[in-house]
A protein has these predicted regions:
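Conserved nucleotide-sugar phosphate-binding/catalytic loop shared by glycosyltransferases and other
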Residues: 1-3, 20-69, 179
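Short amphipathic alpha-helix
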Residues: 8-19
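Active-site-proximal region of nucleotide-activated glycan assembly enzymes
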Residues: 25, 46, 105-162
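Donor-nucleotide binding loops and adjacent catalytic segments primarily
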Residues: 34, 39-43, 161-191
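An aromatic- and histidine-rich active-site surface loop
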Residues: 34-38, 86-107
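An amphipathic, basic-hydrophobic alpha-helix
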Residues: 59-88, 106
Length: 191
Protein backbone atom coordinates (compact mmCIF):
# COMPACT_ATOMS: atom_id res chain seq x y z
CA UNK A 1 0.00 0.00 0.00
CA UNK A 2 1.21 3.45 -0.89
CA UNK A 3 -0.38 6.71 -1.75
CA UNK A 4 -0.06 10.26 -2.78
CA UNK A 5 3.34 10.92 -4.29
CA UNK A 6 5.95 9.19 -6.43
CA UNK A 7 8.30 8.93 -3.47
CA UNK A 8 5.90 6.42 -1.91
CA UNK A 9 4.29 4.90 -5.01
CA UNK A 10 7.33 4.07 -7.17
CA UNK A 11 9.22 2.07 -4.52
CA UNK A 12 5.98 0.18 -3.80
CA UNK A 13 5.60 -0.53 -7.53
CA UNK A 14 9.18 -1.85 -7.62
CA UNK A 15 8.44 -4.32 -4.82
CA UNK A 16 5.10 -5.30 -6.40
CA UNK A 17 6.85 -5.92 -9.73
CA UNK A 18 9.48 -8.10 -8.03
CA UNK A 19 6.87 -10.11 -6.11
CA UNK A 20 4.81 -10.65 -9.28
CA UNK A 21 7.90 -12.09 -10.99
CA UNK A 22 8.21 -14.50 -8.05
CA UNK A 23 4.59 -15.61 -8.71
CA UNK A 24 3.13 -13.97 -5.59
CA UNK A 25 -0.42 -12.63 -5.62
CA UNK A 26 -0.09 -8.88 -5.21
CA UNK A 27 -2.94 -6.70 -3.97
CA UNK A 28 -2.72 -2.92 -4.23
CA UNK A 29 -4.20 -0.44 -1.77
CA UNK A 30 -4.08 3.21 -2.76
CA UNK A 31 -6.02 6.44 -2.66
CA UNK A 32 -8.63 7.65 -5.11
CA UNK A 33 -6.81 10.94 -5.72
CA UNK A 34 -3.15 9.96 -5.57
CA UNK A 35 -0.59 9.34 -8.27
CA UNK A 36 -0.92 5.56 -7.85
CA UNK A 37 -4.17 5.44 -9.82
CA UNK A 38 -2.42 6.95 -12.84
CA UNK A 39 0.77 4.86 -12.79
CA UNK A 40 -0.43 1.43 -11.66
CA UNK A 41 0.40 -0.35 -14.91
CA UNK A 42 1.31 -3.67 -13.35
CA UNK A 43 -1.19 -6.47 -13.34
CA UNK A 44 -2.09 -7.01 -9.71
CA UNK A 45 -4.53 -9.59 -8.35
CA UNK A 46 -6.88 -6.99 -6.86
CA UNK A 47 -6.92 -3.29 -6.11
CA UNK A 48 -8.68 -1.16 -3.55
CA UNK A 49 -8.69 2.60 -3.91
CA UNK A 50 -10.03 4.24 -0.77
CA UNK A 51 -11.31 7.74 -0.17
CA UNK A 52 -8.97 9.02 2.44
CA UNK A 53 -6.84 12.12 2.16
CA UNK A 54 -4.22 13.93 4.14
CA UNK A 55 -5.47 16.74 6.36
CA UNK A 56 -2.47 19.02 6.64
CA UNK A 57 -3.60 21.44 3.93
CA UNK A 58 -7.36 21.00 4.35
CA UNK A 59 -7.88 23.39 7.24
CA UNK A 60 -10.34 22.98 10.09
CA UNK A 61 -12.94 21.18 7.95
CA UNK A 62 -10.40 18.48 7.05
CA UNK A 63 -9.61 17.91 10.72
CA UNK A 64 -13.31 17.75 11.62
CA UNK A 65 -13.99 15.14 8.91
CA UNK A 66 -10.91 13.08 9.81
CA UNK A 67 -12.42 10.74 12.45
CA UNK A 68 -15.37 9.67 10.28
CA UNK A 69 -13.24 9.37 7.12
CA UNK A 70 -10.66 7.30 9.00
CA UNK A 71 -13.28 4.90 10.40
CA UNK A 72 -14.89 4.46 6.96
CA UNK A 73 -11.52 3.86 5.31
CA UNK A 74 -10.48 1.33 7.98
CA UNK A 75 -13.81 -0.48 7.55
CA UNK A 76 -13.29 -0.73 3.76
CA UNK A 77 -9.75 -2.03 4.16
CA UNK A 78 -10.79 -4.57 6.82
CA UNK A 79 -13.41 -5.96 4.39
CA UNK A 80 -10.74 -6.15 1.66
CA UNK A 81 -8.26 -7.92 3.95
CA UNK A 82 -10.83 -10.43 5.22
CA UNK A 83 -11.84 -11.26 1.64
CA UNK A 84 -8.30 -11.55 0.22
CA UNK A 85 -6.39 -12.90 3.26
CA UNK A 86 -2.89 -11.54 2.52
CA UNK A 87 0.07 -13.09 4.32
CA UNK A 88 1.62 -9.69 4.96
CA UNK A 89 0.74 -6.03 4.42
CA UNK A 90 3.58 -3.76 3.29
CA UNK A 91 3.18 0.00 3.66
CA UNK A 92 5.34 2.53 1.84
CA UNK A 93 3.92 5.70 3.35
CA UNK A 94 1.42 8.29 2.30
CA UNK A 95 -1.93 9.04 3.86
CA UNK A 96 -3.68 5.81 2.72
CA UNK A 97 -1.26 3.64 4.66
CA UNK A 98 -2.68 4.83 7.99
CA UNK A 99 -6.12 3.18 7.62
CA UNK A 100 -4.44 0.27 5.82
CA UNK A 101 -1.97 -0.29 8.64
CA UNK A 102 -4.62 -0.02 11.33
CA UNK A 103 -6.83 -2.47 9.41
CA UNK A 104 -3.91 -4.91 9.08
CA UNK A 105 -3.40 -4.80 12.85
CA UNK A 106 -7.14 -5.32 13.49
CA UNK A 107 -7.10 -8.34 11.13
CA UNK A 108 -3.94 -9.70 12.80
CA UNK A 109 -2.08 -9.51 9.51
CA UNK A 110 1.66 -8.77 9.89
CA UNK A 111 2.47 -5.18 8.94
CA UNK A 112 5.82 -4.17 7.46
CA UNK A 113 6.57 -0.54 6.68
CA UNK A 114 9.27 0.88 4.44
CA UNK A 115 10.46 4.46 4.96
CA UNK A 116 12.17 5.84 1.85
CA UNK A 117 13.24 9.20 3.27
CA UNK A 118 15.99 10.41 5.57
CA UNK A 119 13.28 12.13 7.64
CA UNK A 120 10.38 9.73 8.31
CA UNK A 121 6.92 10.76 7.17
CA UNK A 122 3.95 11.10 9.49
CA UNK A 123 2.17 7.94 8.31
CA UNK A 124 5.17 5.71 8.91
CA UNK A 125 5.90 7.34 12.26
CA UNK A 126 2.32 6.58 13.33
CA UNK A 127 2.42 2.99 12.02
CA UNK A 128 5.86 2.14 13.43
CA UNK A 129 4.35 1.02 16.75
CA UNK A 130 1.97 -1.37 14.94
CA UNK A 131 4.62 -2.80 12.60
CA UNK A 132 6.26 -6.18 12.87
CA UNK A 133 9.24 -4.88 10.86
CA UNK A 134 10.50 -1.42 9.84
CA UNK A 135 12.60 -1.21 6.67
CA UNK A 136 14.65 1.90 5.89
CA UNK A 137 15.93 3.52 2.73
CA UNK A 138 18.58 5.33 4.79
CA UNK A 139 20.37 4.04 7.89
CA UNK A 140 19.33 5.09 11.40
CA UNK A 141 16.25 7.07 10.39
CA UNK A 142 13.81 5.24 12.68
CA UNK A 143 14.33 3.30 15.91
CA UNK A 144 14.34 -0.49 15.43
CA UNK A 145 14.55 -0.03 11.67
CA UNK A 146 16.64 -2.21 9.36
CA UNK A 147 18.50 -0.44 6.56
CA UNK A 148 17.71 -2.17 3.23
CA UNK A 149 17.97 0.74 0.79
CA UNK A 150 15.27 1.94 -1.57
CA UNK A 151 13.72 -0.46 -4.08
CA UNK A 152 14.12 0.36 -7.77
CA UNK A 153 12.05 -0.88 -10.68
CA UNK A 154 13.75 -3.38 -12.98
CA UNK A 155 13.94 -0.83 -15.81
CA UNK A 156 16.61 1.02 -13.83
CA UNK A 157 18.81 -2.04 -13.32
CA UNK A 158 19.57 -2.23 -17.05
CA UNK A 159 21.15 1.24 -17.10
CA UNK A 160 24.96 0.97 -17.23
CA UNK A 161 26.89 2.61 -14.36
CA UNK A 162 28.16 6.19 -14.86
CA UNK A 163 31.75 4.98 -15.31
CA UNK A 164 30.66 3.18 -18.49
CA UNK A 165 28.13 5.74 -19.72
CA UNK A 166 30.52 8.70 -19.49
CA UNK A 167 33.91 7.13 -20.15
CA UNK A 168 34.13 8.71 -23.66
CA UNK A 169 32.89 12.10 -22.50
CA UNK A 170 35.01 15.24 -22.26
CA UNK A 171 34.13 18.41 -20.40
CA UNK A 172 31.85 19.17 -17.51
CA UNK A 173 28.64 17.29 -16.82
CA UNK A 174 25.34 19.13 -16.66
CA UNK A 175 23.21 17.89 -13.79
CA UNK A 176 19.45 18.21 -13.39
CA UNK A 177 18.26 18.09 -9.79
CA UNK A 178 14.68 16.97 -9.25
CA UNK A 179 13.17 17.32 -5.80
CA UNK A 180 10.03 15.22 -6.06
CA UNK A 181 6.38 15.95 -6.63
CA UNK A 182 6.01 17.94 -3.40
CA UNK A 183 9.39 19.64 -3.75
CA UNK A 184 12.43 19.14 -1.61
CA UNK A 185 13.19 21.81 0.95
CA UNK A 186 16.90 21.06 1.03
CA UNK A 187 17.22 21.71 -2.73
CA UNK A 188 15.18 24.89 -2.47
CA UNK A 189 17.35 26.15 0.39
CA UNK A 190 20.69 25.29 -1.25
CA UNK A 191 19.89 26.38 -4.78
Amino acid sequence: MAGGTGGHVFPALAVAEYLKKKQWDVFWLGGTKGLERQVLNLEVSRTLFIRFAGVRRNGVLGWLKLPLNLVLAIFNVVKFLIKNKPNVVIGFGGYVTVPGGIAAKLCRCPLVIHEQNATPGLSNRLLAKLSKKILLGFPNTMPKGVHVGNPLRSAFSSIPPPELRYRERNGRLKILIVGGSLGAKVFNDIL
